[in-house]
Amino acid sequence: VPGELFNEQEHYLGRPADITDKIVIRRISLLEQYPAFTGTQYTHLDIGCGNGAAMFLLSQKMKSCVGIDIVNDYEQDINDYLKKNNISNCRFQCVDIEKDISSLQQQFDRITSFEVIEHLHDENSVSIYRKLLKDDGLMAISVPNKWWIFETHGAKLPLLPWNRVPFFSWLPRFLHERWANARIYTKGRITRLLERNGFEVLHSSYITAPMDVLKEGRLKRLLVKYLFKNDTTKNPFKSTAILVIARRRK
């Protein structure tokens, strides 16, 4: 795992997916299929927006979008993309939600946060998402799926230079989190986490592995066409991530 993906405290930040990656397209497609998640009357907050990919794709389907991230590495790229594509209802803000959210100064109708919760210092900081969501708002998050054969975020394993060892993610939690760069979840674990922090889970599904890590070619085309075709799967072993849609519990 490249060193630039860690901050000064050696905390793993991850690498954002590109706007053309299949995983991004699948996430947005699933949100569009969920009744009334998108709408030009809704304000939208993307927590951990990275390079802004999800925000860009949702911009025409929302009233306004704010993308926030713990670092501003992609701020110039985001602003350049917005200007180039004449998008006027989006903006970026550098915010560490685990420290201070006062600069946001509002609550939002819709929140998205893709592959972010596993990077929080304390997973219970998801309670802050609730503070940022309106009473009748909806939230969509995704987290890495424990039952995918490969460790999606890599690990610092002793004596092993390759950090994506098959089945490492299947180890018991106390062993996995000793070496892994990020937490990993089952449907049960992420549901319990959200419920513990004031959310009601409305929907969860396994996002089919997008095969973005493979080089373009015949093998990738065949895998996507025949084994990893649909946006979701009922087979957890074919899924890299879990998508959850939730609302504030009243």
Features from the language model and the residues they span:
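Short beta-strand-to-coil "C-cap" segments at the C-terminal boundary of structured domains/repeats
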Residues: 246-250
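Short, glycine/acidic-rich beta->alpha junctions
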Residues: 47, 120-121
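Conserved N-terminal segment of class I S-adenosyl-L-methionine
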Residues: 1-106, 110-114, 126, 205-209, ...
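Surface-exposed loop/turn positions
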Residues: 42, 136-137
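S-adenosyl-L-methionine-dependent methyltransferase catalytic module, highlighting the catalytic core
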Residues: 4, 8-23, 53, 70, ...
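Generic leucine side-chain signal with a strong bias for well-ordered alpha-helical environments
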Residues: 45, 132-133
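A short His-aromatic
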Residues: 115-119
